[in-house]
Amino acid sequence: MSRIEYLMTSETSGWYARLDHECPERTNQIGIWLDSWLEATRKNQPIAAALPKSWPTLPAGLLSNPGSVLDHLLARFDAQRDGRSPRGIYAPPAKFVDAVLYDELHHGRSRKKEPPATLSLAALPPSFRTFAKQFNENIREEGVVDEGSDEGTKNLTVSGIPIPFADPCVGAGLFAERILRIHAERLADYSPIDRREDTLRLLEGLQLVDTSEVAVDSARKRIVIVLSRLGLVDLDGEGDDGRIGRSEAEMIVESNVRCIDPLRGEWPWNEGPMLLISRPPWLRIKDRFRGHPEGSILRKNLSRELRQFKGADGKVRFSAIKGNVNLYRLYMERSLQLSQRGGRVRLVVPSSVLREKSSLPLRKLLVESNNWDSVWSFPEDSRLLFGGSQGVSVIGVTVGEKTDVLTSFGPLLSDDFSPGRGLVSEAPFFELERGPWSSWTDASWAVPKIPRDASDRSRTLAAIGNLADKPRLVEEGTGLNPGGRSIKVRVGEVEKSMWAKEICDWTGNRGLIPFIRSAHIVFKDGMGVLRHPSFESEPVRELESRNSAWKGPVDMSVPARIVCQAVVNPQSDRRLVWAVVPEGCVLGNSVSYLDLPDEVTVGLKERFGSLEDGLSFLATQLNSEELDLWSKAWAANNNVNNYEIEMLPFEIIEGGATFSLFRNEDHLD
C-alpha cells in the first residue's frame, strides 16, 4: 500500500470512528446518510452540504462516492449485529465491482460474437476480387445476428444487461448501483424515450434480496437516488419522455428488492436469473450471534437446520456441506440452483474455497455439473482491504454446462484492473484442462496458487507436473511405508498454557530438558536445523532461549522425531521446514511431527545405521525445493493443517532412483 493510500485509509477510518462517537446508533447513521444523499440529489448538491452540522467533516476520500460510505456503514452495522468488531470492516470498492461487471458484460456470455474472418479485396489480384466479394457476402450472411429478433433480445436489455439480473445478498445495493451506471453509460447516445423504456425493462428484471430489513431499505432508496443522479428518475414529478416518475420507480423497486432468506426461503420470482452477481457473507456459523447470551444454542440450531433443510420439492437443499457450515459455501450452491440453465454466475468468495478440503464437494459441483470457466485470485497483500487477512477470488460459472477448461487469472493486484474492460491484457493467467487438472488433484478440482513472476510460475508448474503422480506421504504400501499402518501427522504433546508452570527459560542447569517450539526450527543452507541453546555452542537469540526448558515430568520426553515447522507468513521464502529433534526432548504443540510405524523406524535404522541418521535423510528429501513449491501452490490459506502435510507427494530418491524400506529390496520397478 502506498503512503497516499495509507493516509487516505487512515483518514476515512478516523471519520467512521468520529461518527460513532457523534451518532452511536448505526441504523440512525444509515438513515441520516440516505436522507442527506436524497436531499443533496434533489438540490443537485454534494452530499456534504446536506449532512447534519454535528457530523464530522467528510474527508476528501469520501466526498466523491456516497454509495461507498453507505456500503461501509451497512458492513459495520452487520458486524456489530453479529457480535463482531466493526473495526477493520470494509466493503468492496467500486473499482473492483466495475471490473467484475465489465468483464462479464464484455467478455462473458453476453459478449457479441466475433465477426467471422473475411478476405481483404485490396490484397488480392483483380481477377480474384469478384470471387472474394461473393465469398465475403456469404460469410456475413451466415454470421449475422438479428438484434431485433426475439431470440437476440429476450434476455437482454438494449444496454446489454442480461435479465433477470439477481443478487441474493444485495446488501446496500452496491452491484445494483454499478450495473445501473454501466446501463446509463451505454445508453448515452440513445433517445430519451429509448433510455426510459430500457431502464424500465431493467428495473422490472431485477431480482435483489437480502435477509436484513435495513439492507433492503437501503438498497431500495439507493437505487432510486442513483437513477435520479443518472437522469433516469424524476424525484419531484411524474416523469417525462426520458425519466421515470419517482412513484413508479419506487413501486417497481419495492417489488423487485425484497427481504427474504434465500437459503431457507423460496425464490419469489417464477423466472430464474440469467445473470447472478454477488458477494455472499464471508461468515462461518461460529461468526454468528457472538455476544448473544444464547449464542451457542442459536448457532447449533442454525447449523442443524441448514444441514437438514429441505426445499419445496422435499429434497435436501444443500448437498455440498462438509465440515463446519460456512455461509458463503451455501450461498454458492444456492446461486447455482436459482439460476437458469445457461445463465451466468459470478461470485466474490474467499480464496480458500479454491483449495480447502471442506470445499471439495462444492468444487465437484462447479466442475462436474456446471461450466466453471474462470477464476480471479487476489492474494492477501493485494490491497483489497475488504478481504481482511484472506485472499479474494471471483469465480465465473455457466450453469448446467460442462467444464472443459478453467482459466485461472492470478495472482492479481489492484493495478490489474482495466477501466471499462475488466482486467488488463497483461494480467497473468494459466489454463487448467480437465484431464491434467483431474490428475493433478485426484479429482478434487483444487486450483493451485501460482507465482506472478514468469520464471517462478514455470518452476512451480514443473514441480506440480513432476510430483502429481507420486504416492502421498501417509500412504501405505509405498517405498517409505511398506506396511499396513499409515503414517500419522500429530502435534507436540505440550500445550503451553496448560503446562506454563513446567516451562522456563534455558539456563543450562542440570535437570532441565530441552523444550522445542516452532521458533527453534530455522532453514539454513538448504536444511532445517534446530537453533536451541542446548545444542548451540554460541549464544542464541533471546527468542530462542526464552521458554526453552522443561522442568516437568521426565516421561514427557520423546524419542528422536522428524518435525515440521509451518511458516504462516505468506511473504516467507518457505512454507514448510523439516528438521530432526534428537531423543530426550519435549515437543510443544506449535510443532507437528510424523508418527512413524515401527516397520518404518526399523527400516530406517537398518539402512542408515541409526534412527536419527535415517530421519535426517528423510528431512533432507522433504526440504526439497520441489516439495516446497508444491506446498505453496496448494496452500488453502496461511494456516497449515495436518491434511496438507499428509497429502504431500513423497517418494524416496537415492542416487537418482527410488528405493524401498522392504528388507532385501533396494529398488522399485
Label the model's feature ranges:
Residues 329, 336-339, 382-384, 393-394, ...:
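Polybasic, glycine- and aromatic-enriched phosphate-binding surface used to engage nucleic acids
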Residues 2-201, 207, 211-218, 261, ...:
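Class I S-adenosyl-L-methionine
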Residues 221-265:
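S-adenosyl-L-methionine
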Residues 159-162, 169-170, 201-205, 252-254, ...:
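Short, well-ordered loop/turn elements at secondary-structure boundaries
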Residues 195-200, 240-252, 307-311, 365-369:
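Short, conserved catalytic or adaptor-binding loops enriched in Gly and charged residues
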Residues 67, 71, 178, 286, ...:
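Active-site-adjacent "gating/activation" loops or surface patches in catalytic cores
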Residues 1-10, 24, 91-96, 172-177, ...:
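Signature of N6-adenine DNA methyltransferases within the class I
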Residues 72, 76, 80, 99-108, ...:
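Generic, well-ordered alpha-helical scaffold segments in large soluble proteins
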